[in-house]
Amino acid sequence: CIPVYGVFDFSTPFSKKTPYPAKARVLKMVCGGTPETEPECYQQITPANWVSKKTPPFLLIQGETDALIPVKETQAFWHALQSKNRRHSALLTLPLIEHAFDIYPTLTAQCIVPVIEQYLLMLHENYIKQQGIK
């Protein structure tokens, strides 16, 4: 899995510090309320709660100055992966990079492509070794 600026904490839109009213409205429709009124639903849609030893490897890519998805959200998911599953997951945080940096062919977007290629190649090579394929 390679989420680029993925959403990992669905309670963030309800935060008084960083509110996101549009996201909060959608989440209220999905869960039928807020994290306080429908905690079970929010637990079910929180990716960190589903991490196990069977979780596939992740390459998490996140801009450090992303105003929509706080980098701490991605870091928290990374820590969940590390605590429950150590299977070749990686976290790449990009200094001074905002949300949606890959929409236009910027230098940053171009530099990410070889990183993703190398990550996938490493996973493939590990799979080949595990299977005993030559």
Question: Which ranges hold each PLM region?
Answer:
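Active-site nucleophile loop of the alpha/beta-hydrolase fold
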Residues: 2-12
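Hydrophobic pocket-lining residues within nucleotide cofactor-binding pockets
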Residues: 8-10, 47, 97
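Acidic catalytic loop of the alpha/beta-hydrolase fold
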Residues: 10, 65-69
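Mobile cap/lid helix-loop segments that gate and shape the active-site cleft of serine hydrolases
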Residues: 12-50
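Short, flexible helix/strand-to-coil boundary loops that buttress conserved ligand/catalytic motifs
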Residues: 14, 54, 105
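Conserved serine/cysteine hydrolase catalytic core
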Residues: 47-55, 72
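Short beta-strand/loop motif that positions the catalytic acidic residue
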Residues: 54, 59-62, 66
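C-terminal catalytic histidine-bearing segment of alpha/beta-hydrolase fold enzymes
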Residues: 61, 71-134
